[in-house]
């Protein structure tokens, strides 16, 4: 039985052998916008179809929870790069329902890491980062649920 990696490499080899990517496309997006969205597996292909965008139209940045954490976090840096290197004129931020990030907390992920053998010493080094990143989502989720009642 083939491993997942072998399957992916076989698909890539066939893709390249059949020249399925023959059209040259500029690294500069034709529609001059960037899209920030979640890395959720349900959005693969769906987001492009839902928004009517195609290869070469936009810079697409995906991360867990469509998050923009920190004044100069990696997502902010990426967006700045799109503006000042790739001449992006607009940025669209698209979230989705039932986001896994909104349904978890720093306590949840730290518990899971602990149960997989990550030491308390290592967890202490990253605990604050997870609290800053994940716990505001939980607050927003509860606030949103309360507003719906």
Which residues does each PLM region occupy?
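A generic local secondary-structure boundary/capping motif
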Residues: 22-25, 80-83, 144
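Flexible, glycine/proline-enriched loop segments at strand-loop-helix junctions
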Residues: 129-141
């Amino acid at each position: 039985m083939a491993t997942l990696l072998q399957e992916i490499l076989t698909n890539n080899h066939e893709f390249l052998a059949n020249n399925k990517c023959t059209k040259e496309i500029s690294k500069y997006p034709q529609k001059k916008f960037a899209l920030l969205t979640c890395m959720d597996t349900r959005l693969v292909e769906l987001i492009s179809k839902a928004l009517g965008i195609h290869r070469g139209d936009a810079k697409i940045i995906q991360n867990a929870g469509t998050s923009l954490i920190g004044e100069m976090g990696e997502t902010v840096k990426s967006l700045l790069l799109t503006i000042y290197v790739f001449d992006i004129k607009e940025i669209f931020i698209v979230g989705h329902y039932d986001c896994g990030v909104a349904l978890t907390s720093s306590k949840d992920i730290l518990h899971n890491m602990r149960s997989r053998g990550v030491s308390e010493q290592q967890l202490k080094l990253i605990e604050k980062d997870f609290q800053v990143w994940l716990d505001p989502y939980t607050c927003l989720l509860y606030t949103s649920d309360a507003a719906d009642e």
